[in-house]
């Protein structure tokens, strides 16, 4: 982007200004300058960064009409991750978080090395990387990991609590046809070079909240929730915690010893695994059903005092099922934080 034209972007109603270069999306420009806007997939698929163009000339690159319908486009709605500016522009943010914007961290790239890949279940791996400089992030955020020379980039949430160190951990679900995850059992060996870019994500732990904490996940959604949980513990804050985790069968569960230890050491903590395919498992005495069903039952019986903060991370169908349960339970919209894991496009 050498000698690329530079334009001004004005965000209303927050009154924030920034620069954007031609050929750079508005969202990428915000990341570069440490301005965190609401976002999710960064690929025009999820609608998290939907906004409205008030003034100026723009172009939208390829996006899904599920994220931005033709009717919305006709009324000047845009996706910031797909928006290229060709003049100074003014954008109305339809969704924003003042705390998020004040806690922004500029996105940077890091040279990384794979140090270990450990099996937690038959299809869940714990990936450990070392990076060339400390990465500052908030618990619950994610990075893009690239395998150099392959064109393969995937987004993964950190599982470790943020300590400004040079080691990162990721809980990753392995897919046989996954361009990245299929390499975790031999294709990527310890010592393999990688590129890490981030941090991204708005589903990070909000601090100094006195009310109950709900963590709801499935599959590799454990990764950001594990980070949030341990960051909360490290903070010394005291609040009731319920950790709901959806899996198919008992062999799909992991970290059970760690959860049992936490239940003993924390004053009001419960780990509640939900098995969706436990009908033939006579040895299972825990909750049966999908995680949103178990969450709904629990919220009817578990009486909490104070405003609930809920964090839900995992596959899109799970998130779509969990959200109305939280809403019907009276959890305020600003206290619901979601991270939908959408399929990669590349």
Model region roles, listed by residue range:
Residues 198-209:
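A short, basic/flexible loop-to-alpha-helix module at the beginning of a structural domain
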Residues 78-102, 192-196:
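Short, structured interface segments
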């Amino acid at each position: 982007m050498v000698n690329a034209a530079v334009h001004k972007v004005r965000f209303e109603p927050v009154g924030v200004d920034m620069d954007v270069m031609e050929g750079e999306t508005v969202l990428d420009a915000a990341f570069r300058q440490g301005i965190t806007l609401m976002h999710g997939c960064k690929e025009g698929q999820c609608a998290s960064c939907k906004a409205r163009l008030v003034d100026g000339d723009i172009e939208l690159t390829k996006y899904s009409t599920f994220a931005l319908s033709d009717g919305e486009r006709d009324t000047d709605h845009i996706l910031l991750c797909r928006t290229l500016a060709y003049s100074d522009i003014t954008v109305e943010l339809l969704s924003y978080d003042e705390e998020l914007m004040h806690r922004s961290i500029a996105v940077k790239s890091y040279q990384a090395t794979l140090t270990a890949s450990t099996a937690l279940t038959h299809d869940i791996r714990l990936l450990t990387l070392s990076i060339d400089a400390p990465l500052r992030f908030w618990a619950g955020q994610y990075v893009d990991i690239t395998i150099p020379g392959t064109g393969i980039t995937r987004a993964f949430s950190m599982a470790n609590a943020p300590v400004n160190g040079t080691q990162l951990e990721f809980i990753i679900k392995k897919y046989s046809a996954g361009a990245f995850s299929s390499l975790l059992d031999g294709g990527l060996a310890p010592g393999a070079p990688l590129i890490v870019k981030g941090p991204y994500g708005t589903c990070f732990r909000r601090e100094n909240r006195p009310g109950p904490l709900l963590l709801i996940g499935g599959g590799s959604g454990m990764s950001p929730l594990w980070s949030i949980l341990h960051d909360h513990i490290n903070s010394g804050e005291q609040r009731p915690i319920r950790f709901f985790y959806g899996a198919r069968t008992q062999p799909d569960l992991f970290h059970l010893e760690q959860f049992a230890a936490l239940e003993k050491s924390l004053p009001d903590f419960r780990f509640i695994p939900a098995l969706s395919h436990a009908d033939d498992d006579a040895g299972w005495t825990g909750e049966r059903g999908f995680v949103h069903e178990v969450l709904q039952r629990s919220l009817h019986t578990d009486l909490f005092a104070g405003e609930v903060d809920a964090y839900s991370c995992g596959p899109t169908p799970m998130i779509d099922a969990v959200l109305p349960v939280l809403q019907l339970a009276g959890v305020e919209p600003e206290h619901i934080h979601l991270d939908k894991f959408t399929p990669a496009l590349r």
